């Protein structure tokens, strides 16, 4: 784009960016394709959208409308101006329950809309697997449908009216009640009527899902409704700014039948036999997808429910029923009757009936994560989306699957077959290594032959994902000249200058299925450094883990723990996907300065990553941004030298030791404004942040005095009188030097349980601060000393941790540093809360707690949640008689160790914290707040008037005399 073109677009007042960072972020979507745009616009309203699109058109710059960028076929990328509607255009308004309608900005996410509608007893019917990030604009543009198409149909059927932006900048509202674009409508009606016979020939009945062909078949039946033309047009006719939508009542009840099969073909045959039961959905998942759930915390409950480890199978049909009778009783009876009929059908190896909503949600969580689970496969060969959207009639599925296998088996290819069996649509993903010429040849061969196979069945090569780049070249053979020419004329009516998404749907030679592939396929990534970390969980390689990011956008959500900076800001660069893309861009030298380790783009991506580890659990492909970040920082510091600030933060344990030699002086200096101002200027530690205070007495010194004191009370178990045995209490930096009261509370609880406690002598810092700063050699040296120290002692003694980030260092990151015997030590490491809860589960009366009514709210540490289900914390708190506990639905607190202390990160840190703060402020004032992480407690104390406790304090305070506060009495 020339400077003159940029100026013309800038003058509209719209937020438009032409910088390299933004262009690289928007060069990809969830497909295998990559096209670098000239710029990206973020319109705040329809007027701005019209102005910027008009300016681009006048400047001769093509426009690609974009939502969340979850397209699997390249719909949302282009070489001109990307107009992104998901950042600002997220308003929901004009809810009319009587009419059953609502108006939404097209940037509204499906889950956001359904959360808004649920209290009113309504939902938006079409339910796509990407509901946590898919925008309504994208769903309309693709005519999405999802699993429950048998009862809800496609998105087009739920559109009442659309507010659209034309290529000349006009903003028009279209729909059957609106008179706008009357001339255009008449021209299109004339075109479509002439093609009626050809449509009947090309599209015989029975096909439940198919690419709409600009919806001309639907428009033929409703010629006064141009929304039928726009729904499914993939941003090639106009940009959609807002939509009035039909909404549906929530079902009164649901039930689910699971049928397990020995083969995919048997499951497809059974699908045909089950359709008479009128299910809301019949979804298929196969063994390649199910195998990818192994070892993943977020899917373990689902694996247990499905009994996958004890009763393996090749294929599962998920058959869901809705009950919508006039009364709840009748609705329940309707579901029960159909579940009984399903149970009686002689299909499958075994069946399982579910009516518990929580259990059904577990099953859906596996199905919805299908794409990312499959692409999380280890190695360069991945299940690739390119023939994934072809649909046939459900009765044709068995023969269609055999046809696909006859294409792939001679080529030696495996594939996964999962998806919407009730609608005749399987998301078939052949396993290919697109880095190599041989598999690229097979890629082309499979695509060509599948297109021919779909024609034989008179099916649809695309059903709900669109045409995009991947299928444009096949449209003429799929539709024929007459229908394609009708569509081309409709394109000219709306977009005579071919401004919107040019080259897609109508081939001009620029878009082939094997063109515009991501650069890491055509030019495999190479590292300019020797990796230090093992990437031990799965991939065993930096590049392997980086390439696990398929762009699906699972990190672009507002729930769970991934990705907290995206939740706070909505910026693409703040997401796991954005960061992975920028790392890849840096390695491909697509950054300013062409330095793969140091650039503005890389700093923007990595410096705001909190290393919360949320992506390691919630990204089904297990992208580990925390490891990727620290590996890159290490390579940079090894080349350029470790900066002073990173050196200081790497040595917090040493600073604690020094500060505790003169705590009064050290604490006084923390509030001395000139000193704090100097610290901010020299090393960037914010003068406005409180810093951890130093203890008057170190915990380890208190503990020595405690051991030397005579036994007081009945619960003290040192001096060789252990009832249960020996435990090592890991006194981390903050317990030792800053928060000894937490260690004292833990001692009281452990001794009340009858344990003999010791502290590790000559222990070093766990290495977490150094690891987080990319100072990996220092972290490894500390790790080796700690492992050697602990390995030299008794090999079965549990090591109990109070700080989750220290615990995660031992159980995960020591292995990443390739420390000998790290696995052995990791097996002995346990969080204090888990240790106590496990014991009380076996012996509920082991601790004499008082009985008093109280509310407890728990904010778990990110690292704990990335490894363990935090439900055990709620169980533990509720073991205290009279207590009612809840685990807060929160992500990272935003402090993230040193991150929140940095002057340039304070505002973002506080922004990230708002989810935690809002959750706490919504609680009754008397609620006790529990936070296991020292950073979490510090952040909450800084931003509120509340001072959270550690779980050890809650337990110690609840012990009945004489055991209560025994340790403190010996201080």
Q: Where are the regions a protein language model picked out?
A:
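N-terminal glycine-rich flavin-associated loop
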Residues: 8, 31-63, 81, 85-128, ...
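Ferredoxin-type iron-sulfur electron-transfer modules and their immediate structural context
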Residues: 381, 456-461, 468-608, 627, ...
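C-terminal substrate-binding/cap subdomain adjacent to the FAD-binding core in PCMH-type
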Residues: 139-141, 149-155, 159-366, 402, ...
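A glycine-rich phosphate-binding loop feature that marks nucleotide/adenosyl-phosphate handling sites
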Residues: 71-74, 130-137, 208-215, 219, ...
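Flexible, glycine/charged-enriched surface loops at secondary-structure junctions
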Residues: 15-19, 66, 125-128, 196-213, ...
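Iron-sulfur cluster-binding electron-transfer modules in prokaryotic oxidoreductases
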Residues: 495, 502, 626-971
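N-terminal flexible segment immediately upstream of the FAD-binding catalytic core
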Residues: 1-54, 58, 68-100, 129, ...
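Terminal amphipathic helices with adjacent charged low-complexity linkers/tails
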Residues: 243-245, 268-271, 275-381, 385, ...
């Amino acid at each position: 784009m020339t400077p003159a073109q940029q100026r013309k677009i800038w003058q509209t007042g719209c937020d438009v960016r032409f910088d390299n960072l933004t262009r690289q972020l928007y060069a990809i979507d969830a497909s295998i394709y990559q096209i670098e745009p000239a710029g990206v616009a973020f319109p705040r309203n329809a007027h701005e959208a019209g102005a910027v699109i008009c300016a681009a058109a006048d400047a001769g710059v093509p426009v690609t409308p974009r939502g969340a960028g979850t397209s699997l076929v390249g719909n949302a990328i282009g070489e001109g101006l990307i107009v992104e509607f998901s950042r600002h255009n997220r308003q929901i308004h004009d809810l009319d329950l009587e009419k059953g309608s609502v108006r939404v900005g097209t940037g509204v996410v499906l889950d956001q809309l359904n959360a808004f509608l649920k209290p009113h007893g309504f939902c938006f019917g079409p339910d796509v697997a990407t509901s946590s990030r898919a925008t309504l604009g994208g769903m309309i543009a693709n005519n999405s449908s999802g699993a429950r198409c048998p009862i809800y149909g496609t998105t087009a059927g739920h559109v009442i009216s659309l507010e659209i932006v034309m290529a000349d900048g006009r903003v028009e509202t279209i729909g059957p009640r609106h008179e706008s674009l009357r001339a255009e409508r008449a021209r299109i009606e004339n075109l479509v009527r002439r093609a009626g016979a050809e449509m009947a020939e090309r599209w015989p009945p029975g096909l439940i899902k198919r690419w709409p062909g600009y919806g001309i078949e639907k428009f033929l039946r409703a010629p006064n409704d141009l929304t039928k033309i726009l729904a499914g047009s993939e941003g090639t006719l106009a940009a959609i700014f807002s939509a009035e939508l039909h909404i549906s009542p929530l079902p009164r009840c649901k039930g689910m039948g699971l049928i397990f099969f020995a083969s995919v073909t048997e499951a497809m045959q059974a699908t045909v036999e089950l359709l008479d039961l009128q299910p809301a959905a019949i979804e298929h998942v196969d063994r390649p997808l199910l195998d990818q759930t192994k070892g993943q915390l977020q899917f373990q409950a689902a694996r247990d429910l499905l009994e996958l480890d004890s009763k393996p199978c090749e294929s599962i049909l998920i058959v869901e029923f809705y009950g919508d009778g006039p009364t709840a009783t009748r609705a329940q009876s309707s579901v029960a009757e159909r579940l009984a009929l399903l149970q009686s059908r002689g299909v499958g190896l075994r069946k399982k009936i579910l009516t518990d909503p929580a259990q059904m949600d577990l099953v859906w969580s596996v199905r919805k994560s299908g794409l990312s689970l499959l692409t999380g496969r280890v190695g360069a060969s991945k299940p690739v989306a390119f023939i994934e959207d072809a649909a046939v009639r459900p009765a044709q599925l068995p023969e269609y699957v055999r046809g696909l296998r006859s294409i792939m088996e001679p080529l030696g290819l495996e594939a996964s077959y999962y998806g919407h069996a009730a609608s005749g649509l399987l998301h078939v993903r052949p396993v290919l290594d697109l880095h190599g010429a041989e598999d690229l040849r097979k890629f082309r061969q499979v695509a060509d032959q599948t297109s021919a196979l779909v024609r034989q069945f008179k099916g649809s090569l695309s059903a709900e994902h669109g045409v995009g780049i991947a299928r444009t070249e096949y449209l003429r053979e799929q539709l024929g000249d007459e229908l394609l020419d009708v569509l081309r004329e409709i394109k000219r009516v709306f977009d005579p200058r071919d401004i919107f998404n040019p080259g897609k749907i109508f081939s001009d030679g620029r878009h082939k299925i094997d063109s515009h592939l991501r650069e890491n396929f055509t030019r495999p990534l190479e590292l300019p450094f020797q990796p230090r970390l093992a990437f031990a969980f799965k991939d065993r390689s930096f590049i392997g883990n980086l390439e696990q990011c398929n762009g699906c956008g699972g990190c672009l959500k507002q729930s769970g723990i991934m990705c907290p900076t995206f939740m706070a800001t909505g910026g693409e660069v703040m997401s796991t996907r954005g960061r992975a893309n920028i790392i890849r861009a840096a390695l491909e030298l697509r950054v300013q300065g062409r330095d793969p380790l140091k650039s503005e783009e890389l700093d923007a991506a990595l410096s705001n990553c909190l290393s919360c580890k949320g992506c390691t659990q919630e990204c089904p492909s297990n992208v580990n941004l925390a490891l990727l970040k620290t590996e890159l920082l290490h390579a940079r510091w090894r080349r350029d030298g470790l900066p002073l600030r990173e050196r200081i933060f790497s040595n917090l344990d040493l600073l604690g030791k020094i500060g505790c030699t003169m705590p009064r002086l050290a604490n006084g200096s923390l509030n001395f404004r000139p000193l704090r101002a100097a610290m901010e200027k020299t090393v960037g530690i914010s003068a406005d942040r409180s810093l951890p205070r130093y203890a008057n007495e170190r915990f380890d010194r208190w503990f020595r005095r405690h051991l030397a004191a005579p036994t007081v009370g009945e619960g003290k178990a040192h001096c060789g009188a252990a009832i249960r045995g020996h435990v090592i209490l890991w006194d981390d930096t903050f317990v030792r030097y800053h928060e000894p009261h937490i260690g004292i509370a833990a001692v009281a609880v452990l001794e009340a349980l009858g344990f003999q406690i010791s502290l590790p002598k000559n222990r070093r810092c766990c290495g977490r601060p150094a690891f987080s700063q990319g100072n990996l050699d220092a972290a490894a040296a500390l790790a080796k000393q700690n492992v050697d120290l602990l390995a030299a002692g008794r090999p079965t003694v549990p090591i109990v941790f109070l700080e989750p980030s220290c615990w995660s260092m031992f159980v995960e990151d020591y292995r990443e540093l390739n420390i000998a015997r790290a696995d052995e030590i990791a097996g002995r490491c346990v969080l204090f809360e888990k240790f106590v809860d496990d014991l009380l589960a076996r012996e509920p009366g082991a601790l004499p707690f008082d009985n008093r009514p109280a509310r407890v709210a728990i904010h778990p540490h990110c690292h704990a949640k990335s490894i363990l289900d935090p439900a055990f914390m709620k169980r533990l708190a509720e073991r205290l008689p009279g207590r009612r506990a809840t685990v807060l639905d929160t992500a990272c607190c935003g402090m993230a160790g040193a991150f929140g202390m940095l002057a340039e990160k304070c505002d973002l840190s506080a922004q990230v914290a708002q989810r935690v703060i809002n959750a706490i402020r919504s609680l009754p004032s008397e609620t006790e707040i529990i936070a296991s992480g020292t950073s979490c407690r510090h952040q909450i104390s800084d931003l509120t008037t509340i001072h959270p406790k550690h779980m050890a304090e809650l337990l110690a305070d609840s012990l009945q005399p004489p055991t209560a506060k025994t340790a403190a009495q010996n201080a």
